[in-house]
């Protein structure tokens, strides 16, 4: 019997989590909460408009820890990080809500979103419509669907639920087969290419570059994971990828928003540093 991968362990835990949560708060109660939540802020629209201008459309991630790296940021105040990101030029935010593997929390999403005007994606491992409705009830504007964690029927069901409650969908792939499935099953314009293999946690930017020619022009390619320096950003921009999801590079910086600006908007950093002479 093979040892389950990290992703397989996470997914197994998610099914338990849904059972536990739905025993405490019914789907009907969640649906009522979702209807009374703040209106969605237009996650996909914000990214598409920025990328059309050939400007970096950055989804800045708020993430305390990961299974592969452990705790990434000790000084973790989601609202402060969100404000820093907004000042640094982020287009959207991503907030980890997985408790067991990423030390996330639902309240982190609420705190971050309340502190800024940016759209927010709930970054978690979606396996059941309950979690989608829960995301909207928490105030999320978008949800993540990870193709390697779902079959096509479930993927379509979750996307339909997202549409029903007014959420955008970011579909995540990390190889050609997953991309084909995503394009066939979903009509979301947001296609994230995760450069990190979720089974091995190895990272390669070539994953995005290899899949890019197969992503239709009417979809927005978003490169995820492994963007660590200016050269990585320039490599993507040369290949006409203007949308990025970045977490760790920012989370390890003392001021995440300043690091975002340094990586993606270096000209603005120079202007801020050079003061006019009296």
Swiss-Prot record:
PROSITE patterns: IGPS (PS00614)
GO MF terms held by the record: indole-3-glycerol-phosphate synthase activity; phosphoribosylanthranilate isomerase activity
Cross-referenced Pfam families: IGPS
UniProt-listed Enzyme Commission number(s): 4.1.1.48
Catalysed transformations (reactions): 1-(2-carboxyphenylamino)-1-deoxy-D-ribulose 5-phosphate + H(+) = (1S,2R)-1-C-(indol-3-yl)glycerol 3-phosphate + CO2 + H2O
Pathways involved: Amino-acid biosynthesis; L-tryptophan biosynthesis; L-tryptophan from chorismate: step 4/5
Keyword terms of this UniProt record: Amino-acid biosynthesis, Aromatic amino acid biosynthesis, Decarboxylase, Lyase, Tryptophan biosynthesis
Root EC class: lyase
InterPro entries for the chain: Aldolase_TIM (IPR013785), Indole-3-glycerol_P_synth (IPR045186), Indole-3-glycerol_P_synth_dom (IPR013798), Indole-3-GlycerolPSynthase_CS (IPR001468), RibuloseP-bd_barrel (IPR011060)
Signal sequence, renumbered to the chain: none
Single Gene Ontology BP annotation: L-tryptophan biosynthetic process
Similarity comment: Belongs to the TrpC family.
Name this protein carries in UniProt: Indole-3-glycerol phosphate synthase
Source organism (scientific name): Pseudomonas entomophila (strain L48)
Lineage of source species: Bacteria, Pseudomonadati, Pseudomonadota, Gammaproteobacteria, Pseudomonadales
Gene name, Swiss-Prot/TrEMBL: trpC
């Amino acid at each position: 019997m093979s040892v389950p991968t990290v992703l397989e362990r996470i997914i197994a835990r998610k099914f338990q989590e849904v059972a536990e949560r739905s025993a405490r708060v019914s789907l009907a109660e969640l649906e009522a909460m979702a209807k009374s939540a703040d209106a969605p802020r237009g996650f996909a629209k914000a990214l598409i408009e920025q990328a059309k201008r050939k400007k970096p459309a950055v989804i800045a991630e708020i993430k305390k820890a990961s299974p592969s790296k452990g705790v990434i940021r000790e000084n973790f105040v989601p609202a402060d990080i969100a404000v820093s990101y907004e000042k640094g030029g982020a287009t959207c935010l991503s907030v980890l809500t997985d408790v067991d593997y990423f030390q996330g929390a639902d309240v982190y999403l609420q705190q971050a979103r309340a502190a800024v005007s940016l759209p927010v994606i709930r970054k978690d491992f979606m396996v059941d419509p309950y979690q989608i409705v829960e995301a909207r009830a928490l105030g999320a504007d978008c949800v993540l669907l990870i193709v390697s964690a779902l079959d096509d029927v479930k993927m379509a069901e979750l996307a339909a639920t997202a549409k029903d409650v007014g959420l955008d969908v970011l579909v995540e792939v990390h190889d050609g087969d997953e991309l084909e499935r995503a394009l066939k099953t979903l009509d979301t314009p947001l296609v994230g290419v995760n450069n990190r293999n979720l089974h091995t946690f190895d990272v390669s930017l070539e994953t995005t570059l290899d899949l890019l020619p197969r992503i239709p022009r009417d979809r927005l390619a978003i490169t995820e994971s492994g963007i660590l320096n200016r050269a990585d950003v320039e490599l993507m921009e040369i290949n006409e990828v203007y949308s990025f999801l970045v977490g760790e590079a920012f989370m390890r910086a003392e001021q995440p928003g300043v690091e975002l600006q340094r990586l993606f908007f270096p000209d603005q950093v120079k202007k801020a540093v050079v003061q006019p002479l009296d």
